[in-house]
Amino acid sequence: MVHLTSEEKNCITTIWSKVQVDQTGGEALGRMLVVYPWTTRFFGSFGDLSSPGAVMSNSKVQAHGAKVLTSFGEAVKHLDNLKGTYAKLSELHCDKLHVDPENFKMLGNIIVICLAEHFGKDFTPECQVAWQKLVAGVAHALAHKYH
């Protein structure tokens, strides 16, 4: 369980209300595939992922990134029940997709990087603390079925 102060929750919801899910989601997933190229093995049906440019401009990467970040929005809505929120996705990623749970941590950290880039000075160190707690909590909730 993630313990967030009321200030941290406020920071998370304030930033989230300004996030452009399509843009940021596509960027985050694309960055993960570029920075950690072994993760492309889960996306064989996405077509050309042979270079950073191909990954970042791939419409399937953009669409799936938006889907992932939309799902992440559920965490923002249910900050006090992340395990329950992600129970079905945890089962899917564990039992059917066989995704290494470390990937959840990597993607979470990349989401934080993207938010920092997009929001600049509004993404204060205190705000980053809140978001790091949240992405760690989401990663833990998604990995729950693996334990």
Swiss-Prot record:
Q: Name one GO cellular component term.
A: haptoglobin-hemoglobin complex
Q: Which residues carry this modification: N6-acetyllysine?
A: 60, 83, 145
- Gene3D superfamilies in the record: Globins
- Which SUPFAM superfamilies would you find in this protein's record? Globin-like
Source species, domain of life:
Eukaryota
Q: Which residues carry this modification: Phosphoserine?
A: 45
What does the entry list as the binding residues for heme b?
Answer: 64, 93
Which Pfam family is one of this chain's hits? Answer: Globin
PTM sites of type N-acetylvaline: 2
Q: Give the family from UniProt.
A: Belongs to the globin family.
| Protein's name according to its UniProt entry | Hemoglobin subunit beta-M
Origin organism is Didelphis virginiana
Q: What's the gene? A: HBB
